[in-house]
Amino acid sequence: RSATALSDPAGLEMVDQPLSEAVQPGQGNAAGGDASFQWLTAAVELVQAGRCHSLVTAPIAKSLWHAANHRYPGQTERLAELTGSPNASMLFTARSPQSGWRLNTLLATTHIPLAAVPQHLNGALVQRKLDKLLAFCQRFNPAPHLVVAGLNPHAGEAGRLGAEESTWLEAALDAWRRQHPEVQLEGPLPPDTCWL
């Protein structure tokens, strides 16, 4: 049912943005990267002007943005700049059409190599992200159930597969729990099974 609704163009206005030069579909180049960048910018301007009510994006080819001299790690950072939101976060949300159950996933880091993730994570960052996730979730449920995934497989297996959970993540979550005793917070849970 939802696939039909999404594919039905009735009531949808398609806004075309001209290209500065021709691009070949399926052939990545700087012109295509620039077009992608300009389209995102124009889409945000349309929403900000009230001509559109929402913005949905797809993944972009960051290498092509860079080829066109647009030096952003990703579109999240460009969206943050355009909207004056320096502390923006990337959040994915889904709701089951059958049960109404909602899953909201907020990322602690974005657009960095996996090897760099441990150096970017710390207790203060995780607590700030939990504050953002709580504020978002409370828009739909005044008493949300929050879960934090561990960084390592099996949430570190008590230090056998990594120490981040035991050296700082557990303490950060305990401190956040003390500040928010009304919130049900679980974690760090094994990231390989916390989605089940």
Language-model features: where?
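Anion-binding alpha/beta catalytic cores of soluble intermediary-metabolism enzymes, centered on
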Residues: 1-196
